[in-house]
Amino acid sequence: EPEHDFCYYFQKADLARQFKDWDSVVKYGESALSLSDHPFEPAEQFVFIEGYAHVGEWERAVDLSVSSYEVSQDVMGRMLCRLWRRIGEETAPSLERGAALEKVQNMFACDL
C-alpha cells in the first residue's frame, strides 16, 4: 500500500466528522498536519478545527483558525465565524470553550 498523503487523511477525517467521531477526526488531523506536503487550502483546515474543538483542544482549534484566517482574511473571516457559531452551539459550556469563543469573536469580529 502506498504511503498516505494529506488528501487521504483529510477524506478520512471528513468522513469521521460526518459520524461525529471527533477522536478519529483529531487522529487523522494529527497525521495530515504533520506531513510536509500538505497543501494550505484554508477551508481544508475546518474539519480539523471542528474536531479539535469537539475534543476540548481549544487552543489547537483557535491556532488553526488563525492560520486559516491569515491566508485570506476577507473570505475566511466570515467562514470561520459561521464555523465557530456552529461549534458554540454543538459543544458543552466550559471555561476553555468560553475563552476560545471570546478569542475567535474578537479576532474575526464574529457575532457568536
Language-model features: locations:
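C-terminal luminal/periplasmic domains and tails of membrane-associated envelope-modifying transferases
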Residues: E1-L112
